[in-house]
Amino acid sequence: MTESERQCGIDEAGRGPVIGPMVISLVCCDLSFLKEIRVKDSKALTRKRRSELFEKIMGRCSVRYRILHPKDLNRMMAAESLNKIEEDEIVDLLRYADDLVYIDCYDVIEERAQEIIQMRSGRQVVCKHKADAIFPAVSAASIVSKVIRDAEIDRLHDRFGDFGSGYPSDPRTIDFLKKYLKENQDPSEIVRIHWSTVQRLLHSEKNQKKLF
């Protein structure tokens, strides 16, 4: 691929949290432009730098994204795995992509994910772990996904209070979950109820209620 050619990439943000949405983005752009603005994996950038690059990417590149809110994920995960959900969204996004698309691989086996996506979409793809650190278009997609998810998390913070990052490793998130699950019969609006962390807390709460 020459510097003047376009590159397409797909990446997600928010796959692991117990609170908030997962965002999956497709970016197709001139490779020379992506290198000029020095995109890199969103996790290696400050929030300010991500926002700056986000504006440049949105202004010059072809961008599509999907926001899967907790209620969407809860409904889908009643019947499908998270991998299958992400696979479905990727296949849908590929309708808007150029011929070859690089994907940050969601499966532990790269070849399996690549074969399934190519078979379902009829498109040529390359699925790689840590693709966001290898291919500029995937880096750009990771930035778009992260910035959009951060904006969604900010809105949830404004509405529900400080729940931290939303990741199960965050003590603030766990403290919020304990209180929120105790006070709300239907937590599915912001909480991913199929996550093991949530199931353990729900089970613990039910057991405590039985004691009184």
From Swiss-Prot:
It comes from Thermoplasma acidophilum (strain ATCC 25905 / DSM 1728 / JCM 9062 / NBRC 15155 / AMRC-C165). Belongs to the RNase HII family. It holds the Pfam family RNase_HII. CDD domains: RNase_HII_archaea_like (cd07180). A divalent metal cation binds at D11, E12, D104. Endonuclease that specifically degrades the RNA of RNA-DNA hybrids. It catalyses: Endonucleolytic cleavage to 5'-phosphomonoester. HAMAP family: RNase_HII_A (MF_00052_A). It comes from the Archaea. SUPFAM superfamilies: Ribonuclease H-like. One of its GO terms (cellular component) is cytoplasm. It is an enzyme of class 3 (hydrolase). NCBIfam families: ribonuclease HII (TIGR00729). This is Ribonuclease HII. GO terms for molecular function: manganese ion binding; RNA binding; RNA-DNA hybrid ribonuclease activity. The keyword Glycoprotein does not apply.
